[in-house]
């Protein structure tokens, strides 16, 4: 089942189209990266899903049902602009926000304490939010997002303000939430997060969806039949009608690292067979474009051919 489906969603303002006929589907129990530069339309889509604003055209479905007010309790939303009440104590804050999502006070108390204990911060219960560091407040905001056990969790730059240790802690909790049945939507600029966590992605740029799909499928779409070869002996000599030497590095002890691009009709096993006859092969791998490569190139507006050339040159 699809956790979220947006169909032909458009949002216009007086002098600006924030979303232009965007359609995408987010599989249930996936970690979905919603990517794009600032002002692309990501936050507008998130606000529509959270019923903060309405679309001008199109429809949104949550687990097969048209978006309605009953979905408020199904969604957990961590906005980029954090919104805790600074004068409230941590415990009061968590209870208040959980009850807004439909939890009873007793259940909210139970869940709040469970998460504070999990993060080993139970002694923060009576601290005012204004007395917390940015990283500490981030933990409380994260807890408030997930403590009502939402089936759909939307995280807008969730690692902002965290040191590496706490970022890893939050990462582990996100994976655990996914494994326990939640669907996670990431809106992020951190491509390492996309590489490590996301199994599906969509890229929005200038209000339009540019690409979407399983991460591996997107990467495969932009492969350029380029291979990185480590070998000993001599510089590679390959038939120019079938291969292009993109880069060749010389290391100690006659060790070389050569990047080659093969014609599109040549398979990896054919390349290996040809190399074995010409050199002492020590390592062979296909060059897979990173999400950062794909993101930067598409946002720059390069066409497919220029993008493929760029990806073959970047090692």
Language-model region placement:
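Short alpha-helical
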Residues: 85, 192, 235, 266, ...
């Amino acid at each position: 089942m699809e956790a979220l489906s947006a169909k032909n969603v458009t949002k216009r303002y007086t002098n600006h189209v924030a979303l232009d006929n965007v359609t995408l589907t987010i599989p249930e129990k996936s970690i979905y990266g919603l990517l794009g530069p600032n002002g692309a339309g990501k936050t507008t889509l998130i606000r529509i899903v959270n019923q903060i604003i309405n679309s001008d055209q199109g429809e949104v479905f949550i687990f097969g049902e048209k978006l309605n007010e009953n979905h408020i309790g199904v969604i957990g939303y961590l906005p980029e602009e954090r919104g805790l009440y600074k004068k409230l104590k941590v415990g009061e804050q968590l209870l208040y926000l959980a009850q807004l999502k439909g939890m009873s006070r007793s259940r909210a108390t139970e869940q709040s304490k469970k998460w504070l204990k999990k993060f080993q911060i139970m002694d923060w219960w009576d601290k005012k939010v204004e007395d917390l560091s940015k990283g500490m407040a981030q933990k409380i905001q994260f807890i408030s997002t997930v403590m009502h056990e939402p089936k759909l969790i939307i995280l807008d730059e969730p690692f902002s303000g965290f040191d590496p240790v706490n970022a890893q802690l939050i990462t582990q909790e996100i994976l655990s939430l996914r494994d326990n049945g939640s669907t996670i939507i990431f809106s992020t600029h951190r491509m390492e997060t996309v590489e490590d966590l996301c199994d599906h992605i969509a890229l929005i740029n200038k209000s339009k969806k540019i690409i979407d799909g399983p991460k591996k499928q997107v990467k495969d779409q932009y492969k350029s039949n380029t291979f990185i070869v480590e070998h000993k002996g001599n510089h590679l000599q390959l038939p120019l009608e079938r291969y292009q030497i993109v880069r060749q590095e010389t290391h100690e002890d006659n060790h070389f690292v050569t990047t080659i691009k093969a014609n599109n009709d040549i398979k990896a096993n054919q390349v290996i067979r040809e190399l074995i006859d010409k050199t002492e092969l020590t390592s062979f791998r296909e060059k897979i474009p990173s999400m950062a490569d794909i993101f930067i190139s598409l946002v720059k507006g390069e066409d497919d051919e220029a993008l493929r050339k760029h990806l073959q040159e970047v090692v």
